[in-house]
Amino acid sequence: MKEYQVYLERARSRQQDFLYPLIFREYIYGLAYSQNFNRSIFVENLGYDNKYSLLIVKRLITRMYQQNHLIISANDSNKNPFLGYNKNFYSQIISEGFAIVVEIPFFLELSSSLEEAEIIKSYKNLRSIHSIFPFLEDKLTHLNYVSDIRIPYPIHLEILVQILRYWVKDAPFFHLLRLFLYHFCNWNSFITTKKSISTFSKSNPRLFLFLYNFYVCEYESIFLFLRNKSSHLRLKSFSVFFERIFFYAKREHLVEVFAKDFSYTLTFFKDPLIHYVRYQGKCILASKNAPFLMNKWKHYFIHLWQGFFDVWSQPRTININQLSEHSFQLLGYFLNVRLNRSVVRSQMLQNTFLIEIVSKKLDIIVPIIPLIRSLAKAKFCNVLGHPISKPVWADSSDFDIIDRFLRICRNLSHYYNGSSKKKSLYQIKYILRLSCIKTLACKHKSTVRAFLKRSGSEELLEEFFTEEEEILSLIFPRDSSTLHRLNRNRIWYLDILFSNDLVNDE
């Protein structure tokens, strides 16, 4: 009890009412524009859609200052006095400003937490989403059961705002945030539909992801707390999640609710070989023991979502499967544990024995069908995987067209170089190569064969297959056997911070 009271007091001492004035500072919106402009896009760098104008920001801040624009009129609900006439453009600017402002205190708290845990030097590698796969390679081969869980969306955005209020005590800021979401997301309805949430997430991705991540961290904090109290393997790096208001009361209520199913103490959860991995809205729970314990955690998740977040979830939506008989999808890969059986002859004196040895190996496979579906959606091929031209790029120069296709191939190869088998990756690169050739032929109003014969582009287009080997040769010795072995083995790059549309994780 005392240790968590100390946590709460320390959290309260850091909470200050300073977020509201920042929303009226011009440099906040300039910072939001700069971060969006410099963000590297996975498919191609298209830049920022909306032009940044200091005059527009000044006009918007003036509107927000005026009291008559902050009054909600119930009799005239069709008009939008808060955002004015340019609703979509102003809402985009305001949402990015909200996202920048609200991230500031949590970034400072995260930095201090990392310094206390003495992992600040390796934080850049820990940020990589590919750092999950080396962990899975080490752990999954020793486990037997896995549960593939899709985290449900909250039924109302007010739940997300309430979760954020546990961390920051700034009433004016939250009034302004609610006012903005009220006009933009139509909070008149009791339940926010999945379609409206999807629209909000696409038009305001940064603010939505920030609110949604806090919703996920709220339930994860209780899960990690129970996990740490039931295991001798403490997760000190997640201590930042535990500093929140009413956390101890939630924990006591949770134990009381599950006393009937989980016994009267938390010692029932003792399992040193249960592992939890999450990315975005999908999490993987794996264990070595019998599925009885996995069922307990399954019901814990369901009751937690229903009791604390008013999110309805059915038990049948969470399945528990044997790893040797089930494959699951994570971060654009298909993962399954394959059993390798081998027979060893053993001789003892005059007797000879045949011993069967079973070993496990984690297969990480490139999903060819979802990738072809993504390429077809981007108009690089049809639904059967046959390459087609990209006429919208025909106005660019030959060098720019080839550079665009090379960038996509380079990023795909960079992302999927950890796969067990490279055949699917080579098929995708082959589709992009032919699509590039057809696009160039379409630009020059010629057939593919005539264009290649006339321009002699074979050597230039060989970069689709040779560039990766040249990069590896700069890192490793120029030995053909070494490069051949590297092409067969998995290589994880710890500089990949996010996935994109071509990496379909549905």
Curated annotation (Swiss-Prot):
One of its GO terms (cellular component) is chloroplast. The keyword S-adenosyl-L-methionine does not apply. Usually encoded in the trnK tRNA gene intron. Probably assists in splicing its own and other chloroplast group II introns. Belongs to the intron maturase 2 family. MatK subfamily. Keywords: Chloroplast, mRNA processing, Plastid, RNA-binding, tRNA processing. It comes from Melilotus albus (White sweet clover). InterPro entries: Domain_X (IPR024937), Maturase_MatK (IPR002866), Maturase_MatK_N (IPR024942). Its main location: plastid. It comes from the Eukaryota. It is found in: Plastid, Chloroplast. One of its GO terms (molecular function) is RNA binding. The gene is matK. The keyword Chloroplast applies. This is Maturase K. GO terms for biological process: mRNA processing; RNA splicing; tRNA processing. It holds the Pfam family Intron_maturas2.
